[in-house]
Regions:
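A Rossmann-like FAD-binding core segment of flavoenzymes
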Residues: 74-75, 110-113, 117-125, 193-294, ...
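Flexible, glycine-rich terminal cap/loop adjacent to redox cofactors
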Residues: 9-13, 19, 25-37, 49, ...
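FAD-binding beta-loop-beta segment adjacent to the flavin cofactor pocket
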Residues: 144, 288-302, 383-396, 400
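Glycine-rich flavin
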Residues: 3-6, 22-29, 34-169, 202-206, ...
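Beta1/beta-strand and adjacent pyrophosphate-binding region of the FAD-binding site
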Residues: 2-16, 169-179
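Glycine-rich dinucleotide-binding loop and its adjacent helix/turn
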Residues: 48, 140-195, 199, 227-228, ...
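Short hydrophobic core segments
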Residues: 9-11, 116, 131-141, 175-176, ...
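FAD-site-proximal beta/loop scaffold in flavoenzymes
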Residues: 153-170, 257-333
Length: 465
């Protein structure tokens, strides 16, 4: 076996690995990419793309059912799940060529498909072939973490890796885990016609989000028929005929049985480290993944980590992209630079969407005391939302005493598109006074940001006249 030598090897064909490989090749480096399964990663095959496609189907189903409010008679809306899932597959098929081995080989990347195993800190073995590089990037991502619930394996269950291949629409869907993945899929199936229960161990819904915004979203999900069991533990599962019975223990210790046609486990993620041979090179890991510093360097010179595999990192596709670009700078150029995580937005793609950047109101009060400002605008009062018949929501901006943006929170249709404005404000230290002076086109939902910012200006001049 004769080694093939590269400047850079990316292990993993998800976002971090793909950006590293394409970027490195574009800079003129000799690059290899190793992927043991399908290129495109979790986002394309089991996450962002299929879930958003299914949510689009579900939103359309809801719109059809409520079309009479707009003077449109549609009759009974029937969901054909096989056709809905075929739409999901078509969306994936349109995007997949961008991440394909053929495209990357065309970019000049050596693509090796198989399990990568570290031989030493500069060498990997893949299907009997040895690849050597000055720098290696671990970007193997994560997989669903399945809790040790007695009877679960025998009962059968879905994760985000299998739910998009479900054969029939469940009459009742039980979702264990009330985070973004579980909640998005819960709403999708509820709108498609399933009765949905969410079983969440934490006593508060979306505990990491702003409490006011999360409470508003929960109200809307409950109004759509989703049933929440908060502070509840899934104790054991069993099969009764074609149904799954889940025994759930509430916070007060009382146990109840929930029966469903399908069970979805959405309780978090675990790092994909098995089989890499990290012990051969003594890369430090923990339960969260590969330990790396702000410059994405592991404890072993020349070995980096990027994307969801990084322990303690924010597990978002856009963060994986930023990490990969930082690795390229640090691995291929003199000097080094850290990733700036001070203004990272994220979105939960329910309807309405929940978008967030920076500190919550509670976090801001803990750090800055009572001098903070909180400026709100109800989405339902915005002209465009009224015209669209959109759902209620809220724009909430948290500022320091000078009016600089510390955090922004939006519950609205298109919140994911709107949060960029508040992210820029945070990134560059803008004040809400400056935001209030930005001309926004009328009528748009984004006017709510300007109107929220104007609340501080009004409060400043209140009583002057």
């Amino acid at each position: 076996m004769h080694p093939t030598t590269f400047d850079l090897i990316a292990v993993g064909g998800g976002t971090a690995g793909l950006v590293t490989a394409a970027g490195g090749a574009g800079l003129g480096a000799k690059v290899a990419l190793v992927e043991r399964h399908r290129m495109g990663g979790e986002c394309l095959w089991n996450g962002c793309v299929p879930s958003k496609a299914l949510l689009a189907v579900a939103k359309t189903a809801k719109m059809v059912r409520h079309a009479r409010a707009f003077g449109i008679e549609t009759g009974n809306a029937r969901v054909h799940l096989n056709e809905a899932l075929a739409h999901v597959k078509r969306v994936q098929a349109r995007i997949a060529p961008h991440d394909s081995p053929e495209r990357f080989r065309g970019l000049g990347v050596h693509v090796a498909q198989g399990q990568a195993v570290f031989v030493d800190r500069h060498t990997l073995e893949v299907n009997g072939e040895r690849l050597t590089a000055r720098n290696i990037v671990i970007a193997t991502g994560t997989s669903p973490a399945v809790p040790p619930i007695p009877g679960l394996a025998e009962t059968g269950f879905h994760t985000n890796e299998t739910i998009f291949d479900i054969a029939e629409l469940p009459t009742t869907l039980l979702v264990v885990g009330g985070g973004p993945i579980g909640t998005e899929l819960a709403q999708a199936f509820a709108r498609l016609g399933s009765t949905v229960h969410i079983i969440e161990a934490l006593p508060v819904f979306f505990a990491r989000e702003d409490a006011e915004i999360a409470a508003l979203l929960r109200e809307q999900l409950e109004a759509e028929g989703i049933r929440f069991h908060l502070g509840a533990q899934a104790m054991r599962a069993r099969r009764e005929g074609s149904s799954t019975v889940l025994v759930v223990r509430a916070a007060d210790g009382q146990e109840t049985e929930l029966t469903g046609d399908a069970l979805l486990i959405a309780t978090g993620r675990r790092p994909n480290m098995d089989g890499l041979g990290l012990e051969h090179v003594r890369v430090v890991t923990d339960r969260g993944g590969v330990v790396a510093d702000a410059r994405l360097r592991t404890n072993i010179p020349g070995i980096y980590a990027a994307g969801d595999i990084v322990s303690g990192g924010l597990k978002f596709t856009h963060v994986a992209d930023v990490m990969a670009r930082a690795v390229l700078r640090n691995a291929l150029f003199p000097g080094s630079s850290a990733v700036d995580y001070s203004a990272v937005p994220w979105v939960t793609y329910t309807d309405p969407e929940l978008a967030r950047v920076g500190l919550t109101e509670h976090e801001a009060r803990e750090r800055h005391g009572s001098s903070i400002g909180v400026w709100r605008r109800e989405i339902g009062a915005v002209d465009r939302v009224i015209a669209d018949g959109g759902p209620p929501g809220l724009v909430k901006i948290v500022t320091d005493r000078r009016g600089r943006v510390l955090g922004g929170h939006i519950l609205s249709a298109h919140a994911g598109d709107m949060i960029g404005e508040l992210t820029i404000a945070m990134k560059f230290g803008l004040t809400v006074g400056q935001l209030s002076g930005v001309i926004h086109p009328y009528p748009t939902t984004a006017e709510a940001i300007k109107q929220a910012a104007e609340q501080r200006v009004k409060s400043t001049f209140a009583g002057w006249m």
